């Protein structure tokens, strides 16, 4: 049963009637948010034995871990209010070691954690490389003007914390899009994209050496601009985003694996999991995402069982912009999961003021 089918009202009700002997949820991070229909339908399933598998048990905050345990072991971590008071709050806000250790002791008996290096000794090595993008003078002027304009608007924002946080995130998204290509923010401007130019240089070198490449972006319209570039250069490619029907999705994956196309353009959310694309030995992330675990899962479309060659992952990061600030958060995001699963330090959730500081520092 797919998650798309599960969250349909009629199918969800039908599946909730019997008591199943065993229920297994793969890619269980898809039910991390208790407010979603998908999560609510999953919680209604009755089973004597439940297993979940996920590469990202904590993507953003500990409330996600609470919801996963609500499925496999209801009541273990108490109500969400109790969990936030006893664990999430002290750990995320105050880096409380005692609370962290108590939570770890509670959940550890129910977790079997394996990292790739422990179970796949025969897998070729993976190399991660950050490529810095230098904005042109015109792009830098545009970015700084946009940054100042957004800061002025945010400084005038009134109202509750969550409302301000939403507006700050929207401003950050606009800056991130400007880092990719000015046309994504101001379509009427005819500024060339330094990031697209660097991408072209890297890609042509890879093609000259007979490599195949996966290209990920969070922005579908950014992928559209890259498609236009590939069309102009006569480069064969496959394409997949959230609007690609399942049957067509499989057809394009199979075609790429069979050698049809040297490049596969993929939206991060649509193709970051569940694909086997070992025909590629290079991965390019066009824009950094908040959570490095999501990028890692996308890179693992190439670096997985069946891969015979070393895999290289490039991340294109624009200098002196919001992208550098996001990359600096990656280490803290890794801490959030590792501190509970392995016992390291932890970072807290990001509030509106902390998000605003990312914009203030991104120049």
Ranges and model annotations:
Residues 1-95, 104-363:
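ASCE P-loop NTPase motor core, strongest for the SF2 helicase catalytic module
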Residues 100-102:
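Long, charge-dense, solvent-exposed interaction surfaces that engage phosphate-rich ligands
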């Amino acid at each position: 049963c797919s998650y798309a089918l599960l969250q349909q009202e009629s199918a969800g009700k039908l599946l909730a009637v019997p008591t199943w002997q065993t229920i297994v949820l793969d890619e269980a991070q898809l039910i991390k948010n208790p407010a979603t229909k998908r999560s609510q339908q999953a919680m209604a399933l009755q089973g004597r034995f439940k297993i979940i598998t996920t590469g990202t048990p904590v993507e953003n905050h500990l409330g996600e871990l609470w919801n996963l345990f609500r499925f496999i072991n209801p009541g273990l971590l108490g109500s969400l209010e109790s969990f936030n008071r006893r664990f999430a709050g002290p750990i995320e806000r105050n880096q409380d070691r005692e609370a962290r250790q108590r939570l770890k002791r509670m959940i550890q008996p129910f977790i079997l954690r394996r990292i790739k290096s422990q179970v796949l000794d025969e897998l070729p090595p993976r190399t991660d490389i950050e490529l810095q993008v230098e904005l042109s003078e015109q792009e830098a002027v545009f970015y700084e003007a946009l940054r100042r304009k957004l800061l002025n608007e945010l400084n005038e924002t009134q109202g509750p914390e969550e409302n301000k946080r939403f507006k700050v995130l929207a401003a950050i998204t606009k800056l991130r899009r400007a880092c990719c290509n000015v046309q994504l923010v101001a379509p009427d401007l005819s500024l060339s994209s330094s990031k697209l130019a660097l991408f072209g240089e890297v890609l042509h070198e890879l093609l000259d050496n007979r490599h195949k490449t996966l290209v990920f972006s969070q922005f579908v319209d950014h992928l559209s601009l890259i498609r236009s570039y590939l069309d102009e250069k006569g480069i064969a490619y496959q394409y997949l985003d959230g609007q690609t029907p399942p049957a067509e999705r499989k057809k394009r994956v199979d075609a790429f694996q069979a050698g049809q196309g040297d490049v596969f353009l993929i939206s991060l959310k649509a193709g970051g999991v569940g694909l086997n694309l070992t025909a590629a030995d290079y991965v390019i992330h066009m824009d950094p995402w908040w959570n490095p675990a999501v990028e890692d899962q996308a890179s693992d479309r190439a670096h997985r069982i069946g891969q015979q060659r070393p895999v290289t992952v490039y991340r294109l990061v624009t200098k002196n912009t919001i992208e550098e600030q996001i990359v600096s958060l990656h280490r803290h995001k890794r801490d959030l999961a590792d501190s509970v699963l392995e016992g390291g330090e932890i970072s807290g959730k990001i509030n509106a003021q902390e998000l605003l500081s990312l914009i203030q520092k991104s120049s």
